[in-house]
């Protein structure tokens, strides 16, 4: 009988990426296969997130449910990873005796050894250290699961915003070597991946070593990835305004593979609150980045993060945020009510905004952004959009689902042979969370991924002129 592994994941795309690597790791080295049912598993792993309110309590509630499974099967191994594991460490074991393994985001590569230790009789194995980039050297080769893939290019954050736990749970910024990233993406492209999303807590802080000892900037990395054969779309998540430099903006001018969609968190439109958050920039600087981006790529659409009700936020501060939203015209947002995170500087500030006021501000903010998003959607009516077909529609498996360059989901009737390829669809209807399209053409009619023979390339060269100079016409 095969050994079964169940992983429950909470939180960001980095956690989703880490969970996929845990599955690959335990599958390759110890023969575990994934199961959706916790009751079937020999190992239960909980990959946690500490961003949301009461994150710790959510973890212990889940562990309480899993304890009943361990009571029935004492050989069941339970592991807790992710940011709550980094934050709480041994305290998790003290409170939940059913837990066997506690590991941080930077030590997931040691899971096979930790499991062996538990099997050998150790009562608790805990490793929440920060061994820099070591984990990437110990992970199996990437495995594609569809036409899109996430690739982590760096770990941690060194910005220390006053409200954020990430520097304390994932460590400071550490970049992967450029060649390692290029190799991973090339391997994914060979397996049919067409779109890659570069991941990091602050990707535009990327400074990876090259093979010659020089440093690769994020802008350089974007161009290198875009040049990989088979990669037709490129995204990245998440970035920070203070390092969104002009060289990155320039990539939008000359690299069509980089999509016309950007998630750039701002958190607040009030300079006073931005200062209290230790964001390192003012509202006008954020708007300047957006202006320059739209000059380089006029059709780019922007999403962001907002925190409402930060300590000391007045009605005027909130109106400044609403003004920024009106000025920028966002396509979507992830917006939250502020709640203190233990161990962060902001946790020492008085949480002095009334909860009902926080809820009202959040509702007002979301309503404004929803209006802006719907306006963008309506502008797409009747247009032809190129989408990457990801698979069957969630609501109707007889239809297909794809995503536009601007990250909108489109459902349409089409043949399953189009899954994993690009198609053009006409937008015929608009809904709050998706679009409806009508199939126009498939990839075979688009002249995409066309291979050129040597004689084709030579044919583009004109004969030498009187000065002996040849010209190349792309």
Swiss-Prot record:
InterPro entries per the UniProt record, alphabetical: Elp3/MiaA/NifB-like_rSAM, Methylthiotransferase, Methylthiotransferase_CS, Methylthiotransferase_N, Methylthiotransferase_N_sf, MiaB_methiolase, rSAM, rSAM_horseshoe
UniProt: [4Fe-4S] cluster 1 binding residues: 12, 49, 83
Keyword Protease: no
Keywords for this protein: 4Fe-4S, Cytoplasm, Iron, Iron-sulfur, Metal-binding, S-adenosyl-L-methionine, Transferase, tRNA processing
Residues noted as binding [4Fe-4S] cluster 2 in the record, renumbered to the chain: 157, 161, 164
Family: Belongs to the methylthiotransferase family. MiaB subfamily.
Domain Radical SAM core intervals: 143-375
Subunit structure: Monomer.
Sequence ranges assigned to domain TRAM in this UniProt record: 378-441
Primary site of residence: cytoplasm
Role, per record: Catalyzes the methylthiolation of N6-(dimethylallyl)adenosine (i(6)A), leading to the formation of 2-methylthio-N6-(dimethylallyl)adenosine (ms(2)i(6)A) at position 37 in tRNAs that read codons beginning with uridine.
Source species: Shewanella amazonensis (strain ATCC BAA-1098 / SB2B)
Protein name, per record: tRNA-2-methylthio-N(6)-dimethylallyladenosine synthase
GO molecular function, one term: N6-isopentenyladenosine methylthiotransferase activity
Boundaries of every MTTase N-terminal domain copy: 3-120
E.C. designation(s): 2.8.4.3
Cofactor note as given: Binds 2 [4Fe-4S] clusters. One cluster is coordinated with 3 cysteines and an exchangeable S-adenosyl-L-methionine.
